[in-house]
């Protein structure tokens, strides 16, 4: 088990309100290519109780039931551990959720999104806990899925960027990516994510820097928020006893200017929620200027500016974007110790394209078969249904 506590520094489980026993909540899943949809599910689950335990499946279990994961189990454990609503991570959690698992970790109930998760033989992985009344459901986040993100990487288009309409070519490709012939699965495909102020409020901490805290500014694309970013932010967090980290996220067009191709894979709104979900980040500047200016440093009362070991690309006029913090002597480059980059993730997907398409087709076929069986069961007269006597 990996215990997180409620803050980045860790801590013990606290009693519930009024001194009552804390309500312990269980979630589990693959958590492959973790995005803000996963984070939102865990946020909702945490709100249903006082202490959230998240079980993460092994590579072997995922390959058996779904197909090869994009990230290794160690990478996935660390990504889930970095989500601020998670109190504890259980590595190598069983793929099928049982009462035995809930009892082992003293959990009152488990929470899952309102989509379906099936075993290799097409059975609902939550069947046992549902029958026992120890299952709760939360809303699935519309407009994002791992399938959609993989589709964006494979189809080199900028249609997903902010302020751009989704092209008919992109929509057709994303809707059909990995689908079995004739598939009409309500949980697969793509829809545009609609950002709202309420969603940002739900993800944000809402805390201002306090006296004695060190305000640290970092900036970048933070695209496909991944282990490399987490390792960097964790190292930055350790630079001060009481850090307050502000992450500046560049506009999509700015990122595309210095990254090229169809980057960023996730648009500014999506990247904002992904970064806000990280336990090491206190605040996000949405659409930060590429150059870290004197005005920005003064406005946020920045004590320290950090950048990773990746190349610092000059601004459009050829100037160093970190010229001002360097002049003030408050600039530091941090080695995250990770070699994972957004480019490497995209390369993994491209290299294993056929495997991922086959995986999604297999998943789609199982889910459609389950839906059809449920429809037929519901259409039968009561006395003829399985289990009715």
UniProtKB/Swiss-Prot annotation:
GO terms for biological process: phosphatidylethanolamine biosynthetic process; phospholipid biosynthetic process. Residues 1-20 are annotated as: Disordered. One of its GO terms (molecular function) is ethanolamine-phosphate cytidylyltransferase activity. The modification Phosphothreonine is found at residues 341-342. It comes from the Eukaryota. Ethanolamine-phosphate cytidylyltransferase that catalyzes the second step in the synthesis of phosphatidylethanolamine (PE) from ethanolamine via the CDP-ethanolamine pathway. Phosphatidylethanolamine is a dominant inner-leaflet phospholipid in cell membranes, where it plays a role in membrane function by structurally stabilizing membrane-anchored proteins, and participates in important cellular processes such as cell division, cell fusion, blood coagulation, and apoptosis. Belongs to the cytidylyltransferase family. This is Ethanolamine-phosphate cytidylyltransferase. It comes from Homo sapiens.
């Amino acid at each position: 088990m990996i215990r997180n506590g409620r803050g980045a520094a860790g801590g013990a489980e606290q009693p519930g309100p009024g001194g009552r026993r804390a309500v312990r909540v269980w979630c589990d899943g693959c958590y492959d290519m973790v995005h803000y949809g996963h984070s939102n599910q865990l946020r909702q689950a945490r709100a249903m109780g006082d202490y959230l335990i998240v079980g993460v499946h092994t590579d072997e279990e995922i390959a058996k039931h779904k197909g090869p994961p994009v990230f290794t189990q160690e990478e996935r454990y660390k990504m889930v551990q970095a989500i601020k609503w998670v109190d504890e991570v259980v590595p190598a959690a069983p793929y099928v959720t049982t009462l035995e698992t809930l009892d082992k970790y003293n959990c009152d109930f488990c929470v899952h999104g309102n989509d379906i998760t099936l075993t290799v033989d097409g059975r609902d992985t939550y069947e046992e806990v549902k029958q026992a009344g120890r299952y709760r459901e939360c809303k699935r986040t519309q407009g994002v899925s791992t399938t959609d993100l993989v589709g964006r990487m494979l189809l080199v288009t900028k249609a997903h960027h902010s302020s751009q309409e989704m092209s008919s070519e992109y929509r057709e490709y994303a809707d059909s990516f990995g689908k079995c012939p004739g598939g009409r699965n309500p949980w697969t495909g793509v829809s545009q994510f609609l950002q709202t102020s309420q969603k940002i409020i739900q993800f944000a901490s809402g805390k201002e820097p306090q006296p004695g805290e060190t305000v640290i500014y970092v900036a970048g694309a933070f695209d496909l928020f991944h282990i490399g970013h987490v390792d960097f932010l964790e190292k930055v967090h350790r630079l001060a006893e009481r850090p307050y980290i502000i992450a500046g996220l560049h506009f999509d067009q700015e990122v595309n200017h210095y990254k090229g191709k169809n980057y960023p894979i996730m648009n500014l709104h999506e990247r904002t929620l992904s970064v806000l979900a990280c336990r090491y980040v206190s605040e996000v500047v949405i659409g930060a200027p590429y150059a870290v200016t004197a005005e920005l440093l003064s406005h946020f009362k920045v004590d320290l500016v950090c950048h990773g070991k990746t190349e610092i690309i000059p601004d459009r006029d050829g100037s160093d974007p970190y010229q001002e913090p360097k002049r003030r002597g408050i600039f530091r480059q941090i080695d995250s110790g990770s070699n994972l980059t957004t480019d490497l993730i995209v390369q993994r997907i491209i290299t294993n394209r056929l495997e991922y398409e086959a995986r999604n087709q297999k998943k789609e076929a199982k889910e459609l078969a389950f839906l059809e069986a449920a429809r037929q069961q519901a259409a039968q007269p009561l006395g003829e249904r399985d289990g009715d006597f």
